[in-house]
């Protein structure tokens, strides 16, 4: 946070016109300085003692930037950022985070605190060099003066606001929307202007227990010391399976065990690495921060860029979850029979390939209901039927074998594959299936490459078993699959455009950059994929050295 020194504070009070004339703060450059200063002076919640205390905590980096009259870059510009800055100004209110992070969070202020809040809000966006827009009478306004803002906001009970900045290193995190609400006070309760996920009416005797609207900007969920019924009180982990075809030890083993015939199961494009894992981890840190721990399952050495000292990362070798009799393996079907044996994994986890990338902010609710029921994203069409046939895709034959087990167990037929997207998994269900189908699990486990008699455990069996046993439900989330035989340039550019626009309604939950059929030999495909990855996720994550 950028903080004004004592000299600048004195100048603001003594000669506000000169302060804004000389200031490099863009936002309030056009505002009525006298009006702002008058309101600022009348605020009883801003004290010089707070200024002095804040100044004593300025970092050495910030001091260096101040000498150059610069503002430091913002790593993560989001609603949490403005709440933190307002708390630094001793603003008072509550905030409400939506269950779906693509919806707007809300910042709720008492009507009686409106004037004080607006002073601190305008001071914050000024000192942080932020740009403000809001929806008013059906139009998006770019206010030019404090008078205009005050006239607009004092006439309404709630407004959708947009804050943006040019201080981020990535355009994809340079803006966000939120709802500003002004609550009315009755002698017995506080009434919010719109419905919210907790309670529109807050009784005064509730406030005695939690001190909401008394100090700071607090989370409205603190209305109770217990978790809300729609909140998740369980951890969720993330699991990747990863291979590096350039790993020398892997190459030697691959040559030793590779069958004489070629198929999709043995194509080297299945094992090509463009450092997709690096970008996948960036996408999860940016859009899926709710994850407790990340397990990466592999029979290769970790990539040089990965920071294994990060407490959130755990590298898992095949021998830690599979018996020696099944190693080495080059079959994803085999590896996927054993993911629930990862030491220390949560009962609830998300299984993802390194070519699955999150495109927008997500939370636990995108993958599990609060009661633990998993959310599935099955394809809209079905194509799993008939008998296993030599020469047909291995994933399809694996699904057919799984379908045979499901028909015997549940007396129903299934046809839909899971989309190419992160999958919501439960270890208790996987253990249950392994116990029920030991022969099929063991046979698939010991196939070194995908084979005709495999079962697709995570690709098909788990999802329909969980669905038919009442422990999973279908989700309507959209996902995107991009392959070289698609109009891939158009698809990739569309995702980039929607991301820059923060158009969460149209953005898919995830995008899969799917290699196959020797796609690594397609130069245009490789160029466009790398460009897409570097455009969407340019900033290093904390998982990188």
From Swiss-Prot:
It is an enzyme of class 2 (transferase). One of its GO terms (molecular function) is transferase activity, transferring phosphorus-containing groups. GO terms for biological process: polysaccharide biosynthetic process. Its EC number is 2.7.-.-. May be the polymerase that links individual UDP-N-acetyl-D-mannosamine monomers. In serotype A the capsule is composed of repeated units of (alpha 1-6)-linked N-acetyl-D-mannosamine-1-phosphate. PANTHER family: N-ACETYLGLUCOSAMINE-1-PHOSPHOTRANSFERASE SUBUNITS ALPHA_BETA, PTHR24045. Keywords: Exopolysaccharide synthesis, Transferase. It holds the Pfam family Stealth_CR3. Belongs to the stealth family. This is Capsular polysaccharide phosphotransferase SacB. The lineage of its organism: Bacteria, Pseudomonadati, Pseudomonadota, Betaproteobacteria, Neisseriales. The keyword Disulfide bond does not apply. Stealth proteins are part of a protein family that is conserved from bacteria to higher eukaryotes. Family members were first identified in microbes as proteins that help pathogens to elude the host innate immune system. Microbial stealth proteins are involved in the biosynthesis of exopolysaccharides. Stealth proteins are predicted to function as hexose-1-phosphoryltransferases. InterPro entries: Stealth (IPR047141), Stealth_CR1 (IPR031358), Stealth_CR2 (IPR021520), Stealth_CR3 (IPR031357), Stealth_CR4 (IPR031356).
